[in-house]
Swiss-Prot record:
Gene, per the UniProt record: psi1
Entries under PANTHER family matching the protein: DNAJ HOMOLOG SUBFAMILY B MEMBER 5, DNAJ HOMOLOG SUBFAMILY C MEMBER
Originating species: Schizosaccharomyces pombe (strain 972 / ATCC 24843)
InterPro entries assigned to the protein according to its UniProt record, in alphabetical order: DnaJ_C, DnaJ_domain, DnaJ_domain_CS, DnaJ_subfamily_B, HSP40/DnaJ_pept-bd, J_dom_sf
Function: Required for nuclear migration during mitosis. It is required for the normal initiation of translation.
Domain of life: Eukaryota
Protein's recorded name: Protein psi1
Residue ranges, annotated region (Disordered): 69-95, 176-205
A GO molecular function held by the record: unfolded protein binding
Listed Gly residues bias regions: 81-95
Lineage: Eukaryota, Fungi, Dikarya, Ascomycota, Taphrinomycotina
Keyword Chaperone in record: yes
GO terms for biological process, alphabetical: chaperone cofactor-dependent protein refolding; cytoplasm protein quality control; translational initiation
Amino acid sequence: MVADTKLYDCLEVRPEASEAELKKAYRKLALKYHPDKNPNGEKKFKEISLAYEVLSDPQRRKLYDQYGITEGNAAPPPPGAEGGPGAGFGGFPGAGPGGARTFHFNMGGPGGAQFFSASDPNDIFERVFGHAFAGGGGMGGGMGGMGGMDDDMDMDGGFGTRTRGGGMPGGFANMFGGGGAGPHARRSHPSFGGSRPSQPPAQNEVITRPLNVSLEDLFTGCTKKMKISRHIIDASGQSVKADRILEIKVKPGWKAGTKIKFAGEGDEKPDGTVQDIQFVLAEKPHPVFTRSGDDLRMQVELSLKEALLGFSKQISTIDGKKLKVSSSLPTQPGYEITYPGFGMPLPKNPSQRGNMIIECKVKFPTELTPAQKTAAEAF
């Protein structure tokens, strides 16, 4: 028999729930109520984060089951709660103005309360999922990224990174009747009897799929909508199939190999883990141009006469403009003409472009007439 069930009710589990069941419940609810996915879910997201933080720690859960939990006020904890005898969890300052949220277990008796400071819900999310939520907006401007994709155009490393903004306004008022956290209540590391080593983040399984894009779309930028089918765990615990449209904003100048990652958009597993989906950009072959970094290369075919006496040709650039290419001098096979600023946009500065390089390919005749042989010998 537990003293209080608010935290269990918040995670929609029974008080007898196992560690795996708690984690599964948190994952499901965190994805559902994360403010970047559900603009109205901020309060609920904070509540389930606190619930999971307490119940996933065996020592805290034991105390919660015995005594329940109450939000502290702005005053410092009573004597004995800050590292003295009987404090139990080391010194945790009270939630002063703008400070971290402080809670205590209702143990009764002078100096008997056991205090701890609630962590930033974003940190809890990262510890469980192994990354920040990939999306924009939400939680006081705390989450960066665009539609689930990495905003770094080189895209060699991590994905869906976030920057920390101010703390989340509001609080756990529905559960505990307390006021909101101060504007700087961003990050607090709980400690029970001294510093607790941080746990390595769980690594989600990543499902990789190709994203084929034409050279023209990579030149202008585009939006691709990808329909995916995934398996999710419904309220009854059964795995059901669900379709979803993922929107990918391809930026001008992106290169083959660019990775776009969507956190938590893959299959939900019975153990509570959720797969990530990662798209890897691939360039479709182009009939005229080949790409070399930010440069575009193409070939112009010349007859032997044009190679010897000069030529004038009109070509089309990748964006459809007409460009005159000419020479009045003999042209060697493989000779290259470079036109700066007619290549691909630079990913980090799309207003600038690479080069267009034109290679002259001389077409030699397969046979010569007697007159041509005589002319060639005279030449």
